Amino acid sequence: MDETENNTSIDSVEVGPSSPRVVATPRIPIPVMMRETPLSTKRERQALTPRFRRPAPRMIKTVPQTRSIWSVRKDTTPQLVTPHGPQELESPHYDRANTQTFFEQVFQIDEIIGRGSFGEVFAARCREDSRLYAVKVSIAPMRQHSMSKYREAESHMIIPPHKNLVKFYRAWEETDRLYIQTELCEQSLQQYCSVQHALPENEIWNIFVDLLEAVHHLHSNDMIHDDIKPENIFLTKHKICKLGDFGLVINLKNPNDVKSAEEGDSKYLAPEVLNGKPTFASDIFSLGVTILEAATDLDVPSNGDAWHQIRNGQIPERFFVGISSDLRVLIEQMINKEPMKRPTSDALRKHLSIRTRLDSRRRYILSMDMRDGFCNLMSSILVWCMAFLSVVFHPVTRFHEAINNRRSELCAQFVNNQQHTPIQTPETSKVYSESLTGVALRQASQISPFDFSDDENPPHSQRRLFTGPVSRRLNFDDEMEDEEQATCSSSNSSAIETAEDSLSSPKKPVIPVTRQGTPKSARRLIPSYRNRSGSRDPTHHAGAGDSMNSSILDQERTDRYLRMRLAEQQLDWNDHSNMIDEAPPPMSCPPRIRRSLRDMPRMPVLNFNLLDEPIKKGKEKPVVEPAELRQRPMRNGLKSLRSRMASFQGSSGDEN
């Protein structure tokens, strides 16, 4: 035997017995781009092709359609498509004066779920019932006299409803475009298979039974789908298959549909359709290829030798690994090249493997429909109950809300009326100002001339409550002092009227202090305490240089001082009776300690300059003991009331 007989990698050339031996050359390899791609699965094809593939650009007409100036302008009013002709479309959410279309006004677009040669499919929520629908919108404007103008909409309306067909709601025309509103499913079979790849056989049987029921329903009504493929098969949330997209449906009762029949997708097209017209057997062939793709994850070719290989039944055995013999036999019968040898939909339903699963599948679909209906009913009842309760309890909730709002206003008003207590005047309190003036706090906040800041001494521009400064100083002896000192202003203005002013001018009405937190040094004497300890003659005059007048002035000073002491005692008594046990502000001296420190003598002022002076011999002064300092009497001489009282205005005992 020649060595080259079994060599498949070189060309064998037959030569005669007398001819010389010809050297065989290796066969020229065929480029990869020109090789015929064998049958493969989708996973294998994805491994050979790049992950990202740019989609083909859409055809867009950049030049607008030219119209004659004499052409009649078309009406843009939406027209409802019905079997008896177009009718006017109405909706409570549609406004004719609005420039938006009926679809944009009545529906709220969520996303685009599909694109095709006919148009785009949107997932939109209807504002009339707040439910999601699938709305298919044609891309190109429809021709006025086209025979297939309402073909898909009419097919939906002619076909009786079925549980395995996509439910149709309505269709309308607007601005030469057709809108079809149908049921919204969860995903298509193509999307489901691209994620799951080879499906379990139990799911394959369920898909097979559902699609067979849909095809049988169409064939029993003399309808041919002519476009059965995974892209037009939809799955619900309960994994129930439904057949949709009736754009190429052929009604055998309508001669126009038979004449204008179009071919579907070439991947799932029966071979006899290339030379003829679609039939019931062509739908069975498309259904068989669809089940084959779902069961084996086969990458179905659209043309070439692989396309004919499937039509001839030359499918490798490796694709049927793990598939039962019953399912394989049914698939091979359905994709038979001869249309007469293919089983009909009625014959497939009578098959033993399908008949046993048909009843269980019907019960499952019925139970899911009952479950969805019960859920919708309960949700409707719940909504009505909530509406009823809201109507019943709405007045109660409004009343309760009004009470809470009023309570909040009162609390906020009380908090806002709480005056800030200055740090330097801890003796004042909320009740103190009312006891001093007898006026409510709310009214006091409007007419008080003080700014109640942390500083006890207000600015000079705001001290308008008292009279002008005195022209003379009132001097008292040390023996006239008492525990309680008369108050006066901490500034240059004084609260004590001079003798000359009091005798020469009539008494002016005293303006009461009506602000909470008034410092003790700014108190105004109440008129009721003026004449408590004695009265004086308003006609009496004091001379400037007369000795008799000086004695009278001394007596008048003494009487006035006694009256001031009585007024201070009365005010302190009111403070004690209306005292509220409040925590003293931080960095301030408690009132009890201040009162106890008033009786103690003042601390001596240390003069450190004496230490720097040289001490002369013979003139050394004895050092004064601390005990003597504590027992040293206060300085004699005249001292004004303002300077004496200013020493007790500090908040701590060590102030000078």
Swiss-Prot record:
Main location: Golgi
First-level EC class: transferase
Region (Disordered): 1-24, 449-552, 617-656
Keywords: ATP-binding, Cell cycle, Cytoplasm, Developmental protein, Differentiation, Golgi apparatus, Kinase, Magnesium, Membrane, Metal-binding, Nucleotide-binding, Oogenesis, Serine/threonine-protein kinase, Spermatogenesis, Transferase
InterPro entries: CC_SR_Kinase, Kinase-like_dom_sf, Prot_kinase_dom, Protein_kinase_ATP_BS, Ser/Thr_kinase_AS
Localisation per UniProt entry: Golgi apparatus membrane; Cytoplasm
Annotated catalytic residues: D227
Task of the protein: Acts as a negative regulator of entry into mitosis (G2 to M transition) by phosphorylation of the CDK1 kinase during oocyte maturation. Required for embryonic development, germline proliferation and initiation of meiosis during spermatogenesis. Required for chromosome structure during mitosis and negative regulation of nuclear envelope breakdown.
Membrane topology reported for the UniProt record: Peripheral membrane protein
Organism: Caenorhabditis briggsae
Family (UniProt): Belongs to the protein kinase superfamily. Ser/Thr protein kinase family. WEE1 subfamily.
Gene Ontology annotations of biological process type: embryo development ending in birth or egg hatching; meiotic cell cycle; negative regulation of G2/M transition of mitotic cell cycle; negative regulation of G2/MI transition of meiotic cell cycle; nematode larval development; oogenesis; spermatogenesis
Biased composition (Basic and acidic residues): 617-631
Any Pfam family hit: Pkinase
Entry protein name: Membrane-associated tyrosine- and threonine-specific cdc2-inhibitory kinase wee-1.3
Domain Protein kinase: start-end pairs: 107-354
Positions with biased composition (Polar residues): 1-11, 486-505, 646-656
Binding site for Mg(2+): N232, D245
Gene Ontology molecular function terms on file: ATP binding; metal ion binding; protein kinase activity; protein serine kinase activity; protein serine/threonine kinase activity
